[in-house]
A protein has these predicted regions:
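General marker for long, soluble alpha-helical cores
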Residues: 1-143
Length: 143
Protein backbone atom coordinates (compact mmCIF):
# COMPACT_ATOMS: atom_id res chain seq x y z
CA UNK A 1 0.00 0.00 0.00
CA UNK A 2 1.31 3.45 -0.94
CA UNK A 3 0.20 5.98 1.67
CA UNK A 4 1.26 8.93 -0.47
CA UNK A 5 -1.22 7.85 -3.15
CA UNK A 6 -3.97 7.70 -0.54
CA UNK A 7 -3.39 11.21 0.86
CA UNK A 8 -5.66 13.18 -1.50
CA UNK A 9 -8.57 10.96 -0.56
CA UNK A 10 -8.26 10.94 3.22
CA UNK A 11 -10.64 12.96 5.33
CA UNK A 12 -9.57 15.01 8.34
CA UNK A 13 -9.82 12.01 10.66
CA UNK A 14 -7.58 9.92 8.43
CA UNK A 15 -5.05 12.71 8.16
CA UNK A 16 -5.08 13.12 11.95
CA UNK A 17 -4.28 9.42 12.30
CA UNK A 18 -1.23 10.00 10.11
CA UNK A 19 -0.23 13.09 12.13
CA UNK A 20 -0.50 11.09 15.35
CA UNK A 21 1.60 8.32 13.80
CA UNK A 22 4.31 10.77 12.80
CA UNK A 23 4.35 12.26 16.29
CA UNK A 24 4.47 8.97 18.18
CA UNK A 25 6.99 7.51 15.73
CA UNK A 26 4.81 4.60 14.63
CA UNK A 27 4.54 5.90 11.06
CA UNK A 28 7.82 5.91 9.17
CA UNK A 29 6.80 5.14 5.60
CA UNK A 30 5.61 8.63 4.67
CA UNK A 31 7.53 11.89 4.70
CA UNK A 32 6.48 15.29 5.96
CA UNK A 33 6.99 16.65 2.47
CA UNK A 34 4.35 14.27 1.17
CA UNK A 35 1.74 14.96 3.82
CA UNK A 36 1.97 18.69 4.60
CA UNK A 37 0.00 19.88 1.54
CA UNK A 38 -3.03 17.95 2.72
CA UNK A 39 -3.14 18.98 6.38
CA UNK A 40 -5.27 21.59 8.10
CA UNK A 41 -3.55 24.56 9.74
CA UNK A 42 -3.97 23.09 13.23
CA UNK A 43 -2.42 19.78 12.19
CA UNK A 44 0.56 21.57 10.65
CA UNK A 45 0.94 23.61 13.83
CA UNK A 46 0.76 20.43 15.92
CA UNK A 47 3.53 18.81 13.88
CA UNK A 48 5.63 21.98 13.90
CA UNK A 49 5.35 22.30 17.67
CA UNK A 50 6.28 18.65 18.11
CA UNK A 51 9.39 18.76 15.93
CA UNK A 52 10.45 22.18 17.28
CA UNK A 53 10.30 20.71 20.79
CA UNK A 54 12.24 17.59 19.72
CA UNK A 55 15.24 18.67 17.62
CA UNK A 56 16.87 15.33 18.41
CA UNK A 57 14.48 13.79 15.85
CA UNK A 58 16.50 15.54 13.15
CA UNK A 59 13.59 17.22 11.37
CA UNK A 60 14.29 20.76 10.20
CA UNK A 61 11.33 22.97 11.04
CA UNK A 62 12.01 24.92 7.84
CA UNK A 63 9.86 22.43 5.95
CA UNK A 64 6.76 23.72 7.75
CA UNK A 65 6.99 27.45 6.96
CA UNK A 66 5.46 27.42 3.46
CA UNK A 67 2.46 25.49 4.78
CA UNK A 68 1.88 27.21 8.12
CA UNK A 69 -0.87 29.74 8.67
CA UNK A 70 0.52 33.26 8.18
CA UNK A 71 -0.45 34.29 11.71
CA UNK A 72 1.28 31.23 13.16
CA UNK A 73 4.47 32.07 11.26
CA UNK A 74 4.37 35.63 12.57
CA UNK A 75 3.70 34.54 16.16
CA UNK A 76 6.56 32.05 16.08
CA UNK A 77 8.95 34.52 14.48
CA UNK A 78 8.08 37.22 17.03
CA UNK A 79 8.37 34.72 19.89
CA UNK A 80 11.86 33.77 18.75
CA UNK A 81 12.71 37.44 18.27
CA UNK A 82 11.61 38.16 21.84
CA UNK A 83 14.13 35.50 22.89
CA UNK A 84 16.85 37.43 21.03
CA UNK A 85 16.93 35.26 17.91
CA UNK A 86 16.20 36.16 14.31
CA UNK A 87 15.28 32.99 12.44
CA UNK A 88 16.55 33.73 8.93
CA UNK A 89 14.86 30.66 7.51
CA UNK A 90 11.46 32.12 8.40
CA UNK A 91 12.04 35.56 6.87
CA UNK A 92 10.49 34.86 3.44
CA UNK A 93 7.26 33.81 5.19
CA UNK A 94 6.99 36.60 7.79
CA UNK A 95 4.43 39.33 7.13
CA UNK A 96 5.28 42.98 6.57
CA UNK A 97 3.36 43.80 9.76
CA UNK A 98 5.51 41.49 11.89
CA UNK A 99 8.70 42.85 10.34
CA UNK A 100 7.47 46.40 10.96
CA UNK A 101 6.89 45.50 14.61
CA UNK A 102 10.51 44.36 14.88
CA UNK A 103 11.77 47.54 13.25
CA UNK A 104 9.73 49.64 15.68
CA UNK A 105 11.12 47.72 18.65
CA UNK A 106 14.65 48.03 17.33
CA UNK A 107 14.32 51.77 16.69
CA UNK A 108 12.86 52.29 20.17
CA UNK A 109 15.98 50.74 21.67
CA UNK A 110 18.98 51.98 19.65
CA UNK A 111 21.47 50.40 22.04
CA UNK A 112 20.05 46.96 21.43
CA UNK A 113 22.84 44.56 20.57
CA UNK A 114 20.97 42.69 17.85
CA UNK A 115 22.10 42.26 14.26
CA UNK A 116 19.14 42.94 11.97
CA UNK A 117 21.08 43.22 8.71
CA UNK A 118 19.51 40.00 7.41
CA UNK A 119 16.09 41.67 7.54
CA UNK A 120 16.90 44.33 4.93
CA UNK A 121 15.84 42.38 1.81
CA UNK A 122 12.46 41.67 3.42
CA UNK A 123 11.67 45.18 4.69
CA UNK A 124 9.54 47.68 2.85
CA UNK A 125 10.86 51.13 1.94
CA UNK A 126 9.24 52.83 4.93
CA UNK A 127 10.90 50.48 7.40
CA UNK A 128 14.29 50.87 5.75
CA UNK A 129 13.93 54.64 5.91
CA UNK A 130 12.89 54.41 9.56
CA UNK A 131 16.00 52.36 10.34
CA UNK A 132 18.24 54.78 8.46
CA UNK A 133 16.82 57.80 10.30
CA UNK A 134 17.18 56.05 13.66
CA UNK A 135 20.76 55.10 12.84
CA UNK A 136 21.67 58.67 11.84
CA UNK A 137 19.97 60.11 14.92
CA UNK A 138 21.74 57.66 17.21
CA UNK A 139 25.07 58.30 15.50
CA UNK A 140 24.74 62.09 15.79
CA UNK A 141 23.74 61.89 19.45
CA UNK A 142 26.75 59.67 20.18
CA UNK A 143 29.13 62.33 18.85
Amino acid sequence: MNLASMLPFLDEEGLQILVDGLIDGSLTDISLGEILHFLEDEQIKELYNHYAAHPEKGVSTTIFFPFMDDDDVDKEFLRQFADGKINNEMLPFVSDEALHSIVEQYVANPDWNLDIDDLYPFLDDDDLTLLLKAYLKHKSSAN
